[in-house]
UniProtKB/Swiss-Prot annotation:
InterPro entries: FN3_dom, FN3_sf, Growth/epo_recpt_lig-bind, Ig-like_fold, Long_hematopoietin_rcpt_CS, Type-I_Cytokine_Rcpt. The gene is PRLR. Disulfide bonds join C36-C46, C75-C86. Residues 24-439 are extracellular. SUPFAM superfamilies: Fibronectin type III. This is Prolactin receptor. The chain crosses the membrane at residues 440-460. It is found in: Membrane. Residues 30-128, 129-228, 231-331, 333-434 form the Fibronectin type-III domain. It comes from Columba livia. The lineage of its organism: Eukaryota, Metazoa, Chordata, Craniata, Vertebrata. Pfam families: EpoR_lig-bind (PF09067), fn3 (PF00041).
């Protein structure tokens, strides 16, 4: 209910304001209280300035309250002090009470109130200006003066004798700006003397009570002083001076003569005497002066001296001057000032100044003791350099600038009482420049040498700036740890840095594209020949895939992770799926016609099988033939291979059985990889498209072939031990598992790394040699090792010659690294 009432009131007010805005009428503006003033500390008045009336007749009401009362009163009299004012008479005025006064303006629409003003009567007292100011000139005793008269300010309710006013008078010539103010006192008239004849003057008067402020100045009154005869103006004594503390002289300045010849008389009297004396000598010291010789000069006596000007009309007397001869001593300036420029043995010039004391000062007898002070400056300078010399009459000055002209002056004063004399006449001295020629030459030489040194240093910095900077600020050496990339330390992430340092807290990363091994050529024995094979058999679909796990946990077994190689395999499967419709018979005919070529081609992406669950090196499966044939050589790459082929040629391979201490290292067979063109590659891929994962194998000789070697074993190349751009690749053998049994091999050492290059064949085949280490060979295999050593020389040449006869189509078109293991040429016997 209240909200509805409030909203209705707001709507009504809105309509009212809208109506007022349309008619141009509004409530009155805010009034402002200008001032409150008491004329005589018994009554006071307040004035205000009204605001806008809002287009309607407006009434103004003054309300006040006293500090000791809560009652609010209205103004007692609105007409006594004029419009927009309120007059408080004696009955409504209390000098010791503070009033709180506000003014309210009201019309038909609304009202508005002024800001409150607090009034204390004693602080607002300011009388009116005096009235009835009159000016007239009069002559008395042949002297013309100005007489000014006025009346105190009028008071309404008080008699003229109830208050005492003090007055001030000011006057000036009409054409001037500055006023001359005279304090009059309580009297209401004043005589003004020393007015100039023929000048028009302006006069004003004001007053003040014992409390409060001065009143305003009265209205101006003007008067013209006539040009008639008048007495002389009052003269002014300028000074008195004793040059040697034995005699003294006084000088005065005369005023206007009043239009008549004027005589000036100096009168003096001594302390303790009533007799008045006249000046003994008006001529010795010049006009308007009086000279007191030794007879008329007394020490420790005070003289009262005045000057009187007299003409036919009247006379005037100066203000008195009290003189003690001891304190008016001011000697004449020194004389005989001489300047002499001298030079010492080292030819540095200096200035010698000499002078004489004033001739009237009795310095020899000790009656006067004088101190001296000199000043000098270059002729073109403005400021002087002042030097106190003391009682000596000569002075030496050093460090003068050559080629300049100096001005020198000297003055003096008594050591106890008195004042400084005037400065002596100016003396000039020109300092020659020939005294500094040697120094100038030295500075010129120094400047030239400095310039040459700067030029040489600048030229050196331009030519060899980098060397100098490197010499002055040698570079901070970086860490020289093998395998640490300095660029990786600066910009690499923490994971990359930890991986490079070999920490296993983060999975290791590397640039796999740069570290891939594209080809491996492996030959098992010296006696085996790489001959074409007529067996076009393919691995059975029922072939058992056995997962092999390497024991090398070096972290560098393969630069490729299984995820990267699996992506490669997926890409090849997409290509092979489009080629499954091709007739396999045509491929077999092509393989019969070019049997050795087709067996040299293997699928690029289906060589590798991975165990994605392993966190170690990838697991490489080996295929087992269905007709219980012994397993062939299986090639398992650890790098991202773009085009890899294995030549499955009927050769009689005798694997070298090795065994290490942990019985997990496989032997190192060698196979030959030859690159073929894309057509042959696609044909062979069709043959293997039905199998998701295959292992390229190298078949052994037929059973009826005679071979002095034992049956070959499955040889797995599973890890690259060291792969770097600036080093050779080292291949480690993989663990071999067959039918749940771990075959034990004999390893010629704890590990074998192919790090030495034996020879280069056909500019693209490297023959790698392993490191020579201590070989642990069982006694049962010593005859086999001896036979392999006997057959090594002859068989190596045959194998090398066969590798050279491989058609160019089987070779990789692009440059690749092909590895041959000469250690595999050594036969082994069971």
């Amino acid at each position: 209910m209240k909200q509805k009432l409030r909203s209705s009131v707001q709507i009504i007010l809105l309509f009212a304001l809208t109506a007022v805005g349309l008619t141009g009428q509004s409530y009155p503006g805010k009034p402002k209280i200008i001032r409150c003033r008491s004329l005589e500390k018994e009554t006071f008045s307040c004035w205000w300035k009204p605001g806008s009336d809002g287009g309607l007749p407006t009434n103004y009401t003054l309300f006040y309250s006293k500090d000791s009362e809560e009652k609010i009163y209205e103004c007692p009299d609105y007409g006594m002090s004029g419009p927009n004012s309120c007059y408080f008479d004696k009955n409504h005025t209390n000098p010791w009470t503070t009033y709180n006064i506000t003014v309210m303006a009201m019309n038909e629409i609304g009202s508005n109130s002024s800001d409150p003003q607090y009034v204390d009567v004693t602080s607002i007292v300011q009388p009116d200006a005096p009235v009835n100011l009159s000016l007239e000139t009069k002559t008395s005793a042949s002297t013309t003066y100005l007489l000014a008269k006025w009346s105190p300010p009028p008071l309404a309710d008080v008699t003229s004798n109830s208050h005492v006013y003090r007055y001030e008078l000011r006057l000036k010539p009409e054409e001037k700006e500055e006023w001359e103010t005279v304090s009059v006192g309580v009297q209401t008239q004043y005589k003004v003397n020393r007015l100039q004849a023929g000048v028009k003057y302006v006069v004003q008067v004001r007053c003040v009570l014992d409390i409060g402020e001065w009143s305003e100045w009265s209205s101006e009154r003007h008067i013209h002083i006539p040009n008639g005869e008048s007495p002389p103006e009052k003269p002014t004594i300028i000074k008195c001076r004793s040059p040697e503390k034995e005699t003294f002289t006084c000088w005065w300045k005369p005023g206007s003569d009043g239009g008549h010849p004027t005589n000036y008389t100096l009168l003096y009297s001594k302390e303790g005497e009533e007799r008045v004396y006249e000046c003994p000598d008006y001529k010795t010291a010049g006009p308007n002066s009086c000279y007191f010789d030794k007879k008329h000069t007394s020490f420790w006596t005070i003289y009262n001296i005045t000057v009187k000007a007299t003409n036919e009309i009247g006379s005037n007397v100066s203000d008195p001057l009290y003189v003690d001869v001891t304190y008016i001593v001011q000697t004449d300036p020194p004389v005989n000032v001489t300047l002499e420029l001298k030079k010492t043995v080292n030819r540095k010039p200096y200035l010698v100044l000499t002078w004489s004391p004033p001739p009237l000062a009795d310095v020899r007898s000790g009656w006067l003791t004088l101190d001296y002070e000199l000043r000098l400056k270059p002729e073109e300078a403005e400021e002087w350099e002042t030097i106190f010399v003391g009682q000596q009459t000569h002075y030496k000055m050093f460090s003068l600038n050559p080629g300049k002209k100096y001005i020198v002056q000297i003055h003096c004063k008594p050591d106890h009482h008195g004042s400084w004399s005037e400065w002596s006449l100016e003396k000039y001295l020109q300092i020659p420049t020939d005294f500094r020629i040697k120094d100038m030459v030295v500075w010129i030489i120094v400047g030239v040498l400095s310039s040459l040194i700067c030029l040489v240093m600048s030229w050196t910095m331009v030519l060899k700036g980098y060397r100098m900077i490197a010499f002055i600020l040698p570079p901070v050496p970086g860490p020289k740890i093998k395998g640490i990339d300095t660029h990786l330390l600066e910009t690499g992430k923490s994971e990359e840095l930890l991986s490079a340092l070999g920490c296993h807290g983060f999975p290791p990363t590397s640039d796999c594209e740069e570290l891939l091994i594209e080809y491996l050529e492996v030959e098992d024995s010296e006696d085996q020949q790489l001959m074409p094979s007529h067996d076009n058999g393919h691995p059975s679909k029922n072939a058992k895939m056995i997962a092999k796990e390497t024991d090398s946990d070096s972290g560098r077994g393969s630069c490729d992770s299984p995820s990267l190689l699996s992506e490669k395999c997926r890409e090849s499967r997409a290509i092979l799926s489009t080629l499954q419709t091709q007739d396999i018979r045509d491929v077999q005919e092509n393989n019969g016609r070019r049997h050795w070529e087709t067996q040299c081609i293997a699928s690029e992406q289906k060589i590798l099988l991975f165990n994605n669950e392993s966190t170690k090196s990838p697991i490489w499966p080996a295929a087992q033939l269905p007709d219980n044939q012994p397993p062939m050589f299986a090639y398992h790459s650890t790098v991202d291979v773009h085009k890899i082929t294995l030549c499955t040629i009927d050769v009689n391979i005798a694997p070298v059985l090795v065994e290490n201490e942990e019985q997990h290292q496989p032997q190192y067979p060698i196979t030959e990889t030859v690159h073929d063109n894309m057509e042959k590659h696609r044909e062979v891929e069709n043959l293997y498209s039905k199998t998701d994962q295959t292992t390229v194998q190298v078949k052994q000789n037929r059973p009826n072939d005679k071979s002095p070697f034992s049956k070959p074993k499955l040889m797995d190349y599973v890890e690259v031990h060291k792969v770097r751009q600036d080093e050779v690749a080292a291949v480690l053998l993989k663990h071999k598992e067959n039918s749940g049994k771990i075959e034990k091999y004999t390893v010629p050492g704890t590990s074998k790394e192919y790090t030495k290059v034996s020879t280069v064949v056909d500019h693209n085949i490297l023959v790698l040699m392993p490191d020579s280490r201590i070989q642990h060979i069982p006694v049962s295999q010593e005859p086999a090792m001896e036979m392999s050593q006997n057959l090594q020389q002859g068989q190596t040449e045959k194998n090398m010659s066969y590798c050279l006869t491989v058609p160019s189509e089987c070779k990789r078109e692009t440059s690749a690294s092909e590895y041959m293991d000469p250690s595999s040429f050594i036969p082994a016997f069971k």
